[in-house]
Amino acid sequence: MWSGRFRQPLDPEFEKWQRSFPYDQRLLPFELAASRAHANALEHAGVLSSEELSEIVKALGDIGRRAESSPEFLNDPEAEDVHHFVEKQLAALIGATGYKLHTGRSRNEQIATDLRLFVRESIDTLQNLIADWIEAILARAETAGDSASVLPLAMPAYTHLQPAEPVLAAHWLLAYVEMFLRDASRLADCRKRVNLCPLGSGAVAGATLTLNRQAMAAELGFDAPTANSMDATSDRDFAIEFVDALSLLALHLSRWAEEMILFSTCLLYTSRCV
């Protein structure tokens, strides 16, 4: 794709190395959604006719359905990245009309938008899982000590793997509720900064067309458009912030798993090993 300045073909190994589609194909649903929003904005701006918009939207839907039903459809050795893949498939389905979709749009804003949509969906999925996990812990805490419960009413609390003080089993469980509530809070706070729409930012200095950024943001469920095009297309701090929140969540899950292992050993509960 970027070979116009080269005087000889790229080395096959380099060409394979610089392809990101085997990795970023997971962004395809978000690329298609963002492309639909951009197509609607182009039609509103008078760049696309209503017939062309219908063609593009239908073709984007066809691409998504085929990708879901036939995973081998994504095994395209010629696709450089997810943007190139969609552009190539559009051209195959509707010809020159497919290329018009890229009018007034840059790959810089495309990947920034795709990543924000991906991170936002990941946050929402995790929030639901954390809520279910907290609910399960609370249910166990309420029944600790009951005859049907595997948990005793009281248990030793340990410091440095030595019995320190007696505590209610529910107290130990509720400690994890606090940890996971903080994890959920961090993810919710991160989501506020994720949920801004870069579409309309162009490569770096904004779009040359009059595109309705508010409408594109609303269509994709964003709170608002991003405020600065240079920032929107060049910064990925939201992704780092998300990974940081994940690292703390993973730490708490690891702590839980470690304690489950310890509490299952003869070292801590000899009565269960008799």
Specify the residue positions occupied by each region the protein language model found.
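A helix-coil-helix interface module used to build multimeric assemblies
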Residues: M1-C197, A203-G206, L211-A217
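Conserved helix-loop functional segments at active or binding sites
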Residues: T143, R186-D189, R193, F222-T226, ...
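Short amphipathic alpha-helical interaction segments
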Residues: E31, S234, A245-L248
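Fold-independent oxyanion-binding glycine-rich loops
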Residues: G202, A207, A232-T233, C266
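Active-site-adjacent "gating/activation" loops or surface patches in catalytic cores
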Residues: R213-R236
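Conserved small/polar residues in nucleotide/adenosyl-binding loops
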Residues: Y269-V274
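A conserved active-site cap/scaffold subdomain adjacent to cofactor or substrate pockets
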Residues: A239-I261, T265
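Conserved short-loop catalytic and cofactor-binding motifs
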Residues: L168, M230, D244
